[in-house]
């Protein structure tokens, strides 16, 4: 889909026809849909809505009022909000993902190409604080333009190379910056790679839940 959106939007709609019908009876307060996670590559602002429109129509056939979130180009980063347009649907909500500074949150992450950020980046500098001021200003600008508060669908820091205390500090800083703007925040992930919960011992990682 990301490499050739036009060739795959019918397949995407067919998948959502099945998924939406299967979950149609689930309460909306417990289940929202996201048509496609983190559009990137050739899946961008120029074709985003046209690509998603058939899938959204398929969802609405069985879930007429189900909340649906849509993220923008370039992995739905915060800067994608500036060019994100939404369909005319009162139950569609904008989302963005927040992993800034990427050099901290993804240090040593082997799936990052051409190479992952170097190890040893520490969070909490004056530059990091200024980054939050700059990025929350982007949210205010989006709300001023659209009247809608976006949903932070992902945030977190890779646990393999970042001490837990630093992950707690980062998580708290992001929450304290964005939550006062009314931004709902979803942490990635529950138990893997960027975890909040230790499934092996059956408990929350110290400090993460409170952050």
Residue ranges, per PLM feature:
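Alpha-helical packing segments of well-folded alpha/beta enzyme cores
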Residues: 15, 19, 51, 55, ...
